[in-house]
Amino acid sequence: MTATRTLVVWCPDWPVTAAGIDAETPAAVVFANRVVACSAGARGEGVKRGLRRCEAQGRCPELVIIEHDPGRDARAFEPVVAAVESLTPRVEIVRPGLCALATRGPSRYFGGDHALARLMADTVAMAPTPIVLAPDSGAITPESGARTEVRSGKGAFPSQVGIADGLFAAELAARQSLVVPAGESPQFLAPFPIDALDRPELADLLQRLGIRTLGAFAALPATDVLARFGPEGADAHRLARGRDERMVAGRQPPPDLSVSLELDPPAERVDTAAFAAKQLAHELHEQ
């Protein structure tokens, strides 16, 4: 099965962005006392994912701590998704900060993969942002080649776009703002470290066996991988070989909802208007 040509929009450090904190401010999002995301400013001070909260604060005393809030991340990402859907429907939200779509129709309509990627980057960059760092945001201050680059630094949402064969390769392409030509995903993936699979136990085992890159893993016979590492290993092996069989599951945009009520004669009393509004609210809820 041929991997689906896929576009990915990636907004770096999204949990930090969703909290309304800019990239230069040293900040970290914490869950279960460990850093799950951090800003570029924090990385510059030695903070990284997986560190315990106390160790992160030891490396960067000025670190702003943000409590993990998946709901906030999802709500803040909606303007980005709406911007993507303004160009094409059937967008999959892989997770807040990362969405994907199959490019076959959109690329044909907008003049090819490269044109689509550039347009998407510019469109997302102009997405409106209602995000404001509020007291209840959870932030605690210390006092408390053949590939085309498509990068956009404008607007409120820093984002990068990548296109490749399959969702896995497209996500890695987005991290480099690249359009990988059709059929070249295996070569593109080969130099990446085995950690790119985001399967820590499998990656640790492979590294102990001397297999440190996706290319080295992809070179192993598929039957041997299945026998040694089981179905999970076989699935990871397909990804490393650029044979990502996962289809993009685009969400169906919700229908436009509206209700109306004609008052004849017009309401002259507040209680009459309030009763009509209550009736409309009930009808809207039923939809």
Regions found by a protein language model. Give the residues of each.
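Short, conserved phosphate-binding/catalytic loop or strand-edge motifs used
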Residues: P96-L101, L167-A170, E201, L220, ...
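Residues that scaffold, gate, or flank divalent-cation-dependent active/transport sites
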Residues: M1-A100, G105-S107, H114-D122, I163
